[in-house]
């Protein structure tokens, strides 16, 4: 195995974990399966991560940041708030449809963490990451559009996450893209009912 810096090994193991989970599911992403995927000895895993729990949390952080990075730039100053919200939802959805198995990791990971003692914190941390990402995007949208949300941002973030969870799982079952996109538009319209111009 070529000599690699610890940060590079860690990054490669993280990507290997995502590949294994996408291909085989979370339950089969054992430490041995991950190091085999990365072409590294088992001892490297324990050198790079404190625990499998830590790795699972980092998988959530990594995937969420990728999704957020895709939509963050869609919120621009003076852009209509409806356009920004819809563009962000549609961009997320396009990525979801293009790579559903990767997104499916999130739901498998939640169930795995809730069912396996010692991993409860992974599910809790997972949704803290999701809700924090939505809250940050909602605040960014408001800042650029010059509006205020009339409902507390944490409540709106929970509403967005709950709606997307339902849409994602339903689409994984029936693959009805037209109705899913229509539901996203309803979500955007409902969010915009809870705005008011920002006082200057």
Language model features with spans:
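Short, basic, alpha-helical segments at the C-terminal edge of helix-turn-helix-like DNA-binding modules
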Residues: 61-66
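Short helix-capping/turn signature of helix-turn-helix
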Residues: 49, 108-115
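Hydrophobic alpha-helical connector segments
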Residues: 58, 72-102, 153-160
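Hydrophobic/aromatic-rich alpha-helical bundle segments in the mid-to-C-terminal region
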Residues: 118-124, 141-200
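Helix-turn-helix
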Residues: 9-12, 19-54, 58
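N-terminal intrinsically disordered/low-complexity leader segments
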Residues: 1-8, 196-200
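Amphipathic alpha-helical packing segments from all-alpha helical-bundle domains
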Residues: 98-104, 117-143
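Solvent-exposed, amphipathic alpha-helical segments
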Residues: 16-23, 70-74, 105, 109, ...
């Amino acid at each position: 195995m070529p000599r690699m810096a610890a940060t590079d090994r860690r990054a490669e193991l993280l990507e290997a974990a995502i590949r294994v989970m996408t291909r085989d599911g979370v339950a089969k992403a054992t430490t041995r399966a991950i190091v085999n995927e990365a072409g590294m000895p088992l001892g490297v895993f324990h050198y790079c991560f404190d625990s499998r729990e830590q790795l699972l949390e980092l998988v959530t952080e990594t995937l969420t940041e990728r999704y957020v990075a895709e939509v963050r730039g869609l919120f621009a100053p003076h852009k209509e708030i409806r356009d920004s919200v819809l563009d962000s939802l549609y961009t997320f959805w396009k990525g979801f449809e293009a790579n559903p198995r990767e997104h499916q990791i999130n739901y498998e990971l939640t169930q795995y963490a809730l069912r396996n003692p010692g991993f409860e914190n992974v599910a809790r941390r997972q949704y803290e990451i999701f809700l924090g990402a939505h809250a940050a995007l909602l605040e960014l949208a408001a800042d650029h559009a010059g509006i205020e949300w009339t409902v507390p941002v944490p409540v709106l973030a929970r509403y967005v996450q709950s709606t997307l969870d339902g849409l994602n799982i339903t689409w994984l079952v029936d693959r009805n893209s037209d109705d899913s996109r229509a539901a996203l538009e309803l979500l955007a319209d409902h969010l915009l009912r809870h705005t008011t111009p920002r006082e200057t």
